[in-house]
Amino acid sequence: MSVPLILTLLAGAATFIGAILGVIGQKPSNRVLAFSLGFAAGIMLLISLMEMLPAALRTDGMSPVMGYGMFVVGLLGYFALDKMLPHAHPQDLMQKNAKPTRGNIKRTAILLTLGISLHNFPEGVATYVTASNNLELGFGIALAVALHNIPEGLAVAGPVYAATGSKRTAILWAGISGLAEILGGVLTWLILGSMISPVVMAAIMAAVAGIMVALSVDELMPLAKEIDPNNNPSYGVLCGMSVMGLSLVLLQTAGFG
């Protein structure tokens, strides 16, 4: 099994960590969840804009028009997909004082599982493609995806557990959303494998960079603010950028870049 595929599997499996937290009652504070989302957004923004897009543009045969064009395609593709997906709000379900009715909880959990699963599929593709092209960036993307998969697993498992009273069912439902991400990576591995030209890989990377920027700005940062409105999510974003930037410098200095 390839390292990029293993990274994708681990990132998707992080959903189960959140699911377990959602049923054992040891829920992290909203402040911690919000910071982790901001941290993940910071990692994605730095890798996308400072590493993935420049690397794609430096590829022989990749014109600036095609590179930036694919970046915009990624941005627009994310927002088009976002418009088509059913929307439920995990931040409403993670509030400690929220007490919705049993029926509403179950319906929201179904929509939430479906929506998160559809969102997670391209994240699995992005993790695999990035790691295939540059392993150190793949580690960064996998870490960012894993960090924001934890609150997603928590958001699904909590309401399902409240609606069904079954810990096993709650973890299973949350796991479905994580499996969608793993499925994205596995299908990419089966379809692309190593039979792909550098230019095509660069075009995919540019599009993935656009998706990651849109995901960070449109979903992760606003969600962090809604979960914890009393604190600025920018702190988590800046920390994520700083830690990821420092780690990339250290890896390059050590000869892994």
Curated annotation (Swiss-Prot):
The entry's keywords: Cell inner membrane, Cell membrane, Ion transport, Iron, Membrane, Metal-binding, Transmembrane, Transmembrane helix, Transport, Zinc, Zinc transport
Ranges annotated as spanning the membrane: 5-25, 32-52, 61-81, 109-129, 137-157, 171-191, 195-215, 236-256
InterPro entries noted in UniProt: ZIP, Zn_transptr_ZupT
UniProt binding sites for Fe(2+): 120, 123, 149, 152, 181
Taxonomy, superkingdom: Bacteria
Reaction it catalyzes: Zn(2+)(in) = Zn(2+)(out)
Record's GO cellular component terms: plasma membrane
Keyword Cell inner membrane part of the UniProt annotation: yes
Primary location class: membrane
Protein localization: Cell inner membrane
Membrane topology: Multi-pass membrane protein
GO molecular function annotations of the record: metal ion binding; zinc ion transmembrane transporter activity
Disulfide bond entries: none
Annotated positions binding Zn(2+): 123, 148, 152
HAMAP family referenced in this protein's UniProt entry, alphabetically: ZupT
Function: Mediates zinc uptake. May also transport other divalent cations.
Family that this chain belongs to: Belongs to the ZIP transporter (TC 2.A.5) family. ZupT subfamily.
Annotated protein name in UniProt: Zinc transporter ZupT
Organism lineage string: Bacteria, Pseudomonadati, Pseudomonadota, Gammaproteobacteria, Enterobacterales
